[in-house]
């Protein structure tokens, strides 16, 4: 199996919405974004699937060394072998790839966030940076496009946090800011014990409104001349925002279920967004 095939398998196996946005890219850009996404999956799985925290830290440290070595032409993993040829072509910065690893390590260091600023820092590491790297691969001609991608990544992560509140709580992680839980009278025990209430719905409506605003702010930043090149990101946005709308329409019943879109619906949204340009 070639490095590119390994990354393709990694990306397709995840069933992620991101995979659908890659379908319409030219081959070279598709290989680059697939390698980037495979890297994100590798380091994310390191934290999510490793039951021993010390081993997870060792693996993340290995990835830091591997990324640094990749920028010197010394890569050993199929993902870095697939990603390395694209570093210069798409101006992919080492600091951004390392920041993603830092974000994964944050999940080992803390399970609660005091306020929105603290949660936003986490979102920047695990999602906004990915947005910046992705936009560079898609083709960004303006600094404003990278700002758009940074904000869009933030909106994606806010959507993930809303969708996965119950699942994350069962893993011992609560990303919703402590001060906002207190503001709406919702406790950590409510989340852990899946106590759906009017207060919880109000809390989630507040979170949803903020995520919707983040999408609007992102779209307002995208320069017209880059809109066509950034269609993959817009496809992701169409899928993620539809998911957010579904969560809201379902009354925020996210404590006991994980709401998702069917593959055929994702494909339809991808095609519709691509055609509209």
Describe the residue ranges of each PLM region:
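Catalytic cores of Mg2+-dependent Asp-rich isoprenoid enzymes
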Residues: 1-157, 162, 166-277
């Amino acid at each position: 199996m070639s490095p590119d095939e390994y990354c393709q398998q990694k990306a397709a196996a995840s069933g992620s919405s991101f995979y659908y946005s890659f379908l319409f890219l030219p081959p070279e850009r598709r290989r680059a974004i697939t390698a980037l996404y495979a890297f994100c999956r590798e380091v994310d799985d390191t934290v999510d699937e490793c039951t021993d925290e010390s081993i997870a830290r060792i693996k993340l440290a290995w990835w830091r060394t591997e990324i640094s070595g990749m920028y010197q032409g010394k890569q050993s993993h199929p993902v870095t072998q697939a990603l390395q040829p694209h570093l210069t072509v798409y101006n992919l910065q080492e600091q951004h790839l390392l920041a993603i690893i830092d974000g994964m390590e944050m999940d080992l260091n803390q399970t609660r966030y005091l306020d929105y600023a603290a949660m936003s820092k986490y979102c920047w590491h695990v999602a906004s940076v990915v947005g910046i790297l992705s936009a560079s691969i898609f083709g960004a001609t303006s600094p404003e496009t990278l700002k758009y991608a940074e904000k869009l990544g933030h909106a994606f992560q806010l959507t993930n946090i809303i969708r996965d509140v119950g699942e994350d709580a069962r893993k011992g992680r609560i990303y919703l800011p402590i001060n906002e839980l207190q503001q709406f009278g919702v406790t950590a025990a409510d989340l852990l014990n899946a106590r759906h209430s009017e207060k919880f719905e109000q809390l989630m409506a507040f979170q949803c409104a903020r995520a919707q605003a983040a999408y609007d702010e992102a779209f307002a930043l995208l320069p017209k001349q880059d809109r066509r090149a950034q269609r993959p990101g817009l496809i992701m946005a169409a899928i993620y925002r539809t998911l957010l709308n579904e969560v809201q329409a379902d009354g925020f019943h996210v404590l006991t279920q994980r709401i998702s879109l069917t593959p055929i619906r994702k494909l339809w949204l991808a095609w519709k967004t691509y055609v509209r340009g």
